[in-house]
Amino acid sequence: MSATLRDVALMAGVHTATAARALSEATRHKVAASTRAKVEQSATKLGYMAHAAAATLRTGRSGFVGMLVPDLANPLFAPMLKSAEARLRTKGWTILIAQVAPHEEDRLTALRTLITKRVDGLILATSQSNDPILTMAAQHNIPTVLINRGLGDRRFPCVVNDDNESMRLTIAHLKDLGHQHFLHLSGPRNSSTGMARLEGFKRWAGSKHAVVEAGNFTRDAGYQSMRAHLLKTPSGCTQTAVVCGNDLIALGAIEAIRESGGDVPNDFSVVGHNDTPFMDLVSPALTTVHVHTDLMGQEAADVLVQRMQAPTSAVPASRLLHPDLVLRDSTAKPRTQKVFKPKR
């Protein structure tokens, strides 16, 4: 027969409630170290394992937090996941991670699965404009925090990078080098980050400059959009600097430039966004905007814990994180020729 919490308490010589507090990550700090050690030793000797369903009935919480991310292979999300998990673990919660496809029904299915696990809260890195998963989360009264993407909906606090500041830093750097003609390869416009960076680009570069929607935050999308832009004008390309929606788009753009007979940075300066791992090891090393993704995960966890512990209180304020521009080898002074004619 499996050991119970009462068995652990009897062996340790403490009240059952004290044993429960000592074995919970969220409350163990409230128990004296010597008492906690006795309880933990007793639990180990008896082979005690907490029963999740019983704990839920006792506390009204499952101890689980759901986190939805669009692409686990994207290195942007690893630091967010790691820091959010570490922070929540210290507060007594375990993260359940779901990777969701862009299709609406797949996203809803993933959220339904988390709801059946009775998650106490959600961290969403997948939010889009008019996203049905937010409607479902609200219908089930699940405390929810948006990470990396914000929608301006006061019901859902967000922890995001200051994308306007990202573009200010980027354009200021390129103008300091002497660039006057810019191209923006934006992310998808149904993404809040894609739109925020596009708006920041227009604000600091001006609305007269060329914008091409990459359609996705991938290397292939960057390649296809840059290649199409280079080939669409028979007389050649007048832009000298390419501002990209993220680092993967930038890598695709560099590939397309090289394939067309161009060079980075001699023919085009290219700037990425996010400073994902290994951008210092590509050739040329990528000038990019560093987003503090580890801090983003930590802050999102803190905001969510605040929401879960006081669900009826005022919604916490969203948090805007300041980026940094990392200068590397993919930017230089503009080429001397006014027009770049691609190899076809």
Q: How would you name each of these model-derived features?
A:
Residues M1-R61:
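N-terminal helix-turn-helix DNA-binding module of bacterial transcription factors
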Residues S42, S83-R87, I133-M136, H140, ...:
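Alpha-helical structural signal in soluble globular domains
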Residues A52, P70-P79, I97-D106, C158-L169, ...:
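Hinge/beta->alpha junction and helix N-cap segments in small-molecule ligand-binding domains
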Residues T59-A172, D176, H229-L231, S235-C237:
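Alpha-helical recognition/docking segments in bacterial nutrient-uptake
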Residues T90-K91, H140, W204-A210, T233-C237, ...:
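Short helix-capping segments at alpha-helix termini
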Residues R118-T126, L183-S186, V212-E213, P234-N246, ...:
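Periplasmic-binding protein-like
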Residues L231-R344:
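Flexible loop/turn connectors
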